[in-house]
Amino acid sequence: MSSGLILLIVAIVLLVIIAYLVGVIIRKRNDTLITSLEERKQALFGLPVNDEIEEVKSLHLIGQSQTSFREWNQKWVDLTLNTFTDIEKHIFEAEHLNDTFNFIRAKHEINSVESQLNLVEEDITAIREALGILKEQEEKNSARVTHALDLYEKLQASVAENEDNFGSTMAEIEKQMKNIEAEFSQFVALNSSGDPVEAAEVLDKAEEHTIALGQITEQIPAIVAKLEDDFPDQLDDLETGYRRLLEENYHFPEKNIEARFQEIRESIRANSSELVTLDLDRARDENTHIQERIDSLYELFEREIAAYKVVAKNSKILPRYLAHAKHNNEQLKHEIARLSRKYILSENEGLNIKAFDKDLKDIEDNVLEIAEAFDQQEKPFSELQLILDRSIKTLASVESGQMDVFAAVKDIEKIESQARQHLEIYVTQLHMIKRYMEKRNLPGIPQDFLSTFFTTSSQLEALMDELSRGRINIEAVSRLSEVATAAIANLEELTYQVVQHATLTEQLLQYSNRYRSFEAGVQNSFEHALKLFEVDNDYQASFDEISYALETVEPGVTERFVNSYEKTRERIRF
């Protein structure tokens, strides 16, 4: 056998071995793919779709929801009965082809199964999502229905428990509840007939009406309590109190109180009748108006009761106060009469006393009897209170005026005594000032000083004349005494000024001798100042003249002399 043939045989054997090995590898790989597809199929088939379908089926869907459920359920049935069976057949065919080394057809079957599984997976996902949506929607709808029914049941229970608190509105409330029941029945009918949209609208209305009626029933008892309990009780209390006050001789500014009671009762009945319309805002407004009218009656009675207490108190005060004021007036009249014999008084005191008499007589004639028998009067106590209050204020004003008059007259004698004492002092001071001036040995007395001196003397004489009269005008005495006091003080100050200017002028004239021989200005001022001093007796002008001249040659000299004089100045010894 030739070597070439041997090589050919060896090559063929090698090719066969390689082909076998390749076939084994491909077969093994396909087995793995087929096993994976089988596991994937089992996993999809094992999903709890049946349980989810049964769960949704138990919800007893109706209408469009039930139709949708049937479609998805049928799709699942088709998958389980047809698609999965077809996939199983293709998997079996792929296994057979792979075992017989028909790899191309086996690969085709594997790809086909994989595509089918992808579609099945998408379908199952869609089915489960649809079932979830149906379940969620149904649960929501069920919750809404349950919530609405719960609200209605609570409303029923509340109305039943508080039936006695709704008064005349009970019939209308029952009517409204029947309407709500009819809406629930309509909802059930529409939902069962497959019209979920309209059914939902009806359910919304039923729920809204339930909530609205619930809110109304919560507010009605308070309104009814006012109309059936509070207002009647208050009116009974008012009428009882009114009768008792009449028995106690109370009178009122209003004469139609009984009619007001009747009008309020009619308003209560009318509001109770109108309440059946469930117009709560109007009912509350009317209740507020009724309460205001009741409160106004309470205020009227309370005002008269309070006025009675004040009148009872003031009726005891006024007679004593009046007697006190009359006594004060008599004392004032006696005191003024006594003082009038010696003094000329101001007309105001007499006029005031007359005005006091008039006020006191008016109270005595018109009010005293009312105060002493106030509980027998046929006037409201509030009016009596005003009368007594005004009278007590008048008495207080009279008393204050009496105190003012007393203060004005009580010091008259003291004023006279002080004026006489001051006059004696002032006359003495006038003589001392005269002696003080005489001791100065002045060349002459300035005319303005003489004028002031004689004016002061005249004012003292006027005060002396007034105090010497048979009846003293005390106002004139007070005025003249004040004038005399000011005049003496002014004369004393002027005396010091005249003496100071005269003394300082003499000193400065002597001091100027050291400058006269060589200062022509000083010499001229000296001559002028000397004339003013000795001839004109104008000591102020003489001082100004010489001091000005010396200041030009020796600044500060005048101040030095003035300071020295003030330290040694002799005072007038009064």
Curated annotation (Swiss-Prot):
Full protein name: Septation ring formation regulator EzrA
Residues on Cytoplasmic side: 27-574
Phylogenetic classification of the source organism: Bacteria, Bacillati, Bacillota, Bacilli, Lactobacillales
Homology family: Belongs to the EzrA family.
Pfam (any one): EzrA
GO CC annotation terms, alphabetical: plasma membrane; septin ring
Coiled-coil parts of chain: 102-131, 161-190, 276-379, 459-493
Record's keyword terms, sorted: Cell cycle, Cell division, Cell membrane, Coiled coil, Membrane, Septation, Transmembrane, Transmembrane helix
Domain of life: Bacteria
Task performed by this protein: Negative regulator of FtsZ ring formation; modulates the frequency and position of FtsZ ring formation. Inhibits FtsZ ring formation at polar sites. Interacts either with FtsZ or with one of its binding partners to promote depolymerization.
Membrane topology: Single-pass membrane protein
Biological process according to GO: division septum assembly; septin ring assembly
InterPro entries associated with the record: EzrA
Principal subcellular localisation of the protein: membrane
